[in-house]
Amino acid sequence: MKPLNLVLGLCILVGCFLSCECHRGPRRHDPRGPFPPPPPPHGPGIGRPHPPPFGPGIGRPPPPPFGPGIGRPPPPPPCPPVPPHPRPPSNPSPPPTPSIPPTGPPTTVQATTMPAASISITTPTARDSTDIFWRLWELINSLLQQE
């Protein structure tokens, strides 16, 4: 899986950091000149338009809930006391060493290619990461072919 992750990661990095300039070509002088300034945001005046005045039938908006005549909000409830964390001992004992069972010699396979020659081939019992990757790849391919 590591080579596949590497390839996908590099593709993502190239896509993120590759500027579009190489697809457009080098920048050239624009013969149209600079763009005109944008129009004012709210018509021909300075700033925003004034809010509508309060007419005879419309009252003022209500005051904020905690204004000068109303009391302050209640304080939050106090937090319960937190017990102190226990201190580790000053001289901790070393962790126990795990017992490793003795390993036997690698398995020996006898090859009988010629009757006169006796050749022994030793193979390690540990799996190679490429072998695991290859089996995973075959599994993915077989699942995709079934669909």
Swiss-Prot record:
A cellular component term, taken from the record's GO annotations: extracellular region
Sequence repeat extents: 43-54, 55-66, 67-78
3 X 12 AA tandem repeats of G-P-G-I-G-R-P-[HP]-P-P-P-[PF], as annotated region: 43-78
Pfam families: PROL5-SMR
Residue span of region Disordered: 27-128
Main location (coarse class): secreted
Stretch forming the signal peptide: 1-22
Extent of Pro residues compositional bias: 33-105
Location of the protein in the cell: Secreted
UniProt keyword annotation of Metal-binding present: no
UniProt keyword terms in alphabetical order: Repeat, Secreted, Signal
Domain of life: Eukaryota
Keyword tRNA processing attributed: no
Tissue: Secreted into saliva by submaxillary gland.
UniProt feature, compositional bias: Polar residues: 108-127
Assigned protein family: Belongs to the PROL1/PROL3 family.
Function: May play a role in protection or detoxification.
Record's protein name: Submaxillary gland androgen-regulated protein 3A
Lineage of origin: Eukaryota, Metazoa, Chordata, Craniata, Vertebrata
GN (gene name): Smr3a
